[in-house]
């Protein structure tokens, strides 16, 4: 819900090409993978020691697993991690665990909102907000 509301609002600012996050040098192209890190550095973060763009993915992955609610396979599919087992990789489809992933992403958005008010661990938040029950 939260992401759709934000993206819908941002879409009104999109140019003719329909991109919401346009590149700084060419508005016809999307932002690069380095844009988030540059923004963090502008805000005063050391992207080699404190936080980096990829670190947000690692944080989300760890928190989702720590909550104990979601299967590792669903988390891995959501993060688009590559399967290390070659045989298994041949049978994995990107569309796996779609319903669980939908619930997981809504739980993640709600978890982030809850942490605006007061810091709470993923494990503790899962006790009071379990969409699987």
Q: Where are each of the predicted segments found?
A:
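C-terminal secondary-structure termini that scaffold catalytic or DNA-interacting sites
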Residues: 2-5, 13-17, 22-28, 83-86, ...
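A generic "functional-site adjacency" signal
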Residues: 1, 55, 69, 101-102
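Short, basic (Lys/Arg/His-rich) helix/loop patches that form interaction surfaces
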Residues: 8-28, 33-77, 81-84
């Amino acid at each position: 819900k939260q992401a759709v509301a934000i993206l819908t609002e941002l879409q009104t600012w999109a140019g003719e090409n329909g991109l919401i996050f346009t590149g700084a040098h060419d508005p016809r192209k999307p932002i690069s993978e380095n844009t988030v890190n540059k923004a963090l550095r502008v805000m005063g973060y050391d992207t080699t020691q404190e936080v980096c763009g990829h670190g947000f993915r690692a944080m989300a992955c760890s928190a989702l697993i720590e909550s104990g609610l979601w299967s590792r396979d669903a988390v891995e599919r959501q993060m688009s991690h590559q399967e290390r087992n070659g045989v298994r990789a041949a049978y994995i489809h990107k569309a796996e665990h779609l319903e669980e992933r939908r619930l997981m992403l809504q739980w993640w958005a709600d978890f982030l909102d809850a942490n605006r008010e007061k810091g709470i661990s993923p494990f503790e938040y899962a006790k009071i907000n379990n969409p699987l029950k």
